[in-house]
Amino acid sequence: GSVITVDDMKSALAKIDYTLKARDIVLIRTGASDYNDEDRYLTDHVGMSAEATRWLIEQDCLVTGTDAPTYDAPVWAMFKTKSIWPAHKVMMSEPYWHIENLTNLGDLPPHGFKLSVFPIKWVGTTGAPVRAVGIIDV
């Protein structure tokens, strides 16, 4: 039920010795996809904080993704704190997009790959399922 903070993001970047560049796409591997076929997938994951989301936008990273079922903390944690979809709501005032339920992030290198995202063409919605494909130059 915890959230990823700005300090968590900075620490993770330092760990892989990487400095964000404008228009980088940031994919966050929380480990949740390791148990996405279990009930706890919906209740036991880490989400992004609104502050960390805004920080990524300030770094000119406008697309992010996570292997968790939602970009925010689990629904039960949001109800407990009475803060519903805070990271999602950043989209109401900032131009960014996020992708949820990603899998196989551990098969990608920490950086240096391309990402293509193919959404289903739905009309009148704010979201749709996608096929996300990591492209690694060899």
Describe the residue ranges of each PLM region.
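Active-/binding-site microenvironments in catalytic and ligand-binding cores
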Residues: G1-V138
